[in-house]
């Protein structure tokens, strides 16, 4: 009778793993810098793919995400307005379409409103408006 260990032996370099190009990757806890570089690569790829992002200008990650959201919404609108899709929606009545305003538009509107509110003479504003704007 042969003695064997209850613990499975681990082979470090399996031929099948090498031939398939499979390698054990480190977890983000093992290498936090690789995770950071990977995220930066993802942001760079998003910057390349979204046509409204200026390529020759440095933009923040937040701006990239806002452009991506706007682009997705624009694609959704284009898809929803495609004749084939429109005819499918007419076949299924009773479903409402929720249209969203892009975040950049909302942010711009809020900025404009706050600037306009600061230009009003204080005697024209109610106490509620002063609390909201001030």
From Swiss-Prot:
InterPro entries listed in its UniProt record: bHLH_dom (IPR011598), DNA-bd_prot-inh (IPR026052), HLH_DNA-bd_sf (IPR036638)
Gene name of this polypeptide: ID2
GO CC annotations on file: cytoplasm; cytosol; euchromatin; nucleus; protein-containing complex
Gene Ontology molecular-function annotations: protein dimerization activity; RNA polymerase II-specific DNA-binding transcription factor binding; transcription corepressor activity; transcription regulator inhibitor activity; transmembrane transporter binding
Keywords of the record: Biological rhythms, Cytoplasm, Developmental protein, Nucleus, Phosphoprotein, Repressor, Transcription, Transcription regulation, Ubl conjugation
Superkingdom in the source lineage: Eukaryota
The bHLH domain, residue ranges: 23-75
Descriptive protein name: DNA-binding protein inhibitor ID-2
Organism encoding this protein: Sus scrofa
Domain notes: The bHLH domain is essential for its repressor activity towards the CLOCK-BMAL1 heterodimer.
